[in-house]
Amino acid sequence: MLNVNFTNGELLNTQGLVVFIDEQLKLDSNLITLDQQHHGLISKTIADKLQFTGKYGQIKVIPSVIKSGEIKYLIIAGLGTEEKLTEAKVEELGGKILQYATSAKISTISLKIINRISRFTSQTFASLVASGAFLASYRFDKYRTNLKEAEKFAVESIEVFTDNNTEAAKLFEVKKLVAEAVFFTRDISNEPSNIKTPQVYAERIVDILEPLGVDVDIIGEREMKNLGMGALLGVGQGSQNESKLVVMEYKGGSKYPTIALVGKGVIFDTGGISLKPSSNMHLMRYDMGGSAAVVGSMIAVAGQKLPVNIVGVVGLVENMLSGNAQRPGDVVTTMSGQTVEVLNTDAEGRLVLADAVWYAQEKFKPKCLIDVATLTGAITVALGSTYAGCFSNNDELASKLIKAGEEVNEKLWRMPLHDEYDAMIGSDIADMANISNIPRAAGSCIAAHFIKRFIKDGVDWAHLDIAGVANSNKVSSLGPKGAVGYGVRLLEKFIKEYNR
């Protein structure tokens, strides 16, 4: 794991020294002194706009001209224009720096925060850059047995020079804790589905949350049957691995209302008898991304001992083919007593959520409930990989979630709810169907309305459809290909601000 230290003294044992310059390309007195120590290397570089313009995210790695000492490279990072610099952008810049250092095989780097950036205190800026680098250091290569030496290389340590190193270290410790929660979310999402069976996944939740003071209860199929969870059980009945409902409760402040987080945990989704195409079916190991975001959020909240009351409920199932699999046309009775005609077995996530959200409301009486799910391909068609979809029955709740997402660059786009969508899930033989009676119309909105049927009056509810953002087929500033860990930082930020 990347080692991060903060100092206000001399930088020691570093191979790469990083400085930050904006588009004005002006050196303050501190940078002028540093430039002189490096024989004008900084001023010469920024004088040539073909080499460096100060544009945000631009990274220039230059061999050092100093023959003595450890420093082999000078790294100049562009800040862009200061008025456009946000906390999220500073974090992403930290990630870019780490990735450039990794490519250049620089094992130790030092970040020198010596020029004044009026939008941030030096300690805030320092902690944000370090946080971004830490997030970008994540790897999932545990099953690679033939890694080349170049692929094994990783930056070992980052030293951050700032005038208030003690406060910067305190700020970073919180960000590091949240990043480690993101790493759990990425890890469990990236795991192959033959490894993370519902039982194994449930046990990992217990192992990580109980030491943090979270009560965890694993509910098996017999108890779920007694509770009347016909929708969730129907999804998993084709699998030889037993479905689980994992219930997590964190009590941090008795005076605060309970927030419920509910996650879809489809460990692997073949589509069932409504079989998916085989070309990208392997990616369905990520179909439990909503549940992973919920667990990661619980880790982040409990790890900080925040004064809030949070419950997490995740339904862990496999949607598999077998002689016992659910059939199109089956009717299931949900825990709420409402019946559902299953017209498409590949619209299974909403069935899992129907029972999970009802259970959360029945047991914990939350004021606010947020469900998170890789629910529909339609949301990816609508929003791509830039935004997740946000549906809500409460404008204030939606606004708070969207604001939290903007602050950590996990963006949400408000999507519509309308009675006409609700009318499209009618059934001739049950209370509702699990898909629209108008093919290919408003798929993500229909799915949201299905879940809304199971939200009780008076509960502030939001549904986050993260199907387009939960995993990525390209490297980002804050992580490699694969699971993104989307939702953990968003929900942690939202929960911190909810009662303010």
From Swiss-Prot:
GO terms for cellular component: cytoplasm. Keywords: Aminopeptidase, Cytoplasm, Hydrolase, Manganese, Metal-binding, Protease. It catalyses: Release of an N-terminal amino acid, Xaa-|-Yaa-, in which Xaa is preferably Leu, but may be other amino acids including Pro although not Arg or Lys, and Yaa may be Pro. Amino acid amides and methyl esters are also readily hydrolyzed, but rates on arylamides are exceedingly low; Release of an N-terminal amino acid, preferentially leucine, but not glutamic or aspartic acids. Gene3D superfamilies: Leucine Aminopeptidase, subunit E, domain 1, Zn peptidases. SUPFAM superfamilies: Macro domain-like (SSF52949), Zn-dependent exopeptidases (SSF53187). Its EC number is 3.4.11.1, 3.4.11.10. Mn(2+) 1 binds at residues 269, 346, 348. Its cofactor is Mn(2+). Mn(2+) 2 binds at residues 264, 269, 287, 348. Binds 2 manganese ions per subunit. InterPro entries: Leucine_aapep/pepB, Macro_dom-like, Peptidase_M17_C, Peptidase_M17_leu_NH2_pept, Peptidase_M17_N. GO terms for biological process: proteolysis. Disulfide bonds: none annotated. GO terms for molecular function: manganese ion binding; metalloaminopeptidase activity. The active site is at residues 276, 350. It is found in: Cytoplasm. Presumably involved in the processing and regular turnover of intracellular proteins. Catalyzes the removal of unsubstituted N-terminal amino acids from various peptides. Belongs to the peptidase M17 family. This is Probable cytosol aminopeptidase. It comes from Rickettsia canadensis (strain McKiel). The lineage of its organism: Bacteria, Pseudomonadati, Pseudomonadota, Alphaproteobacteria, Rickettsiales. The gene is pepA.
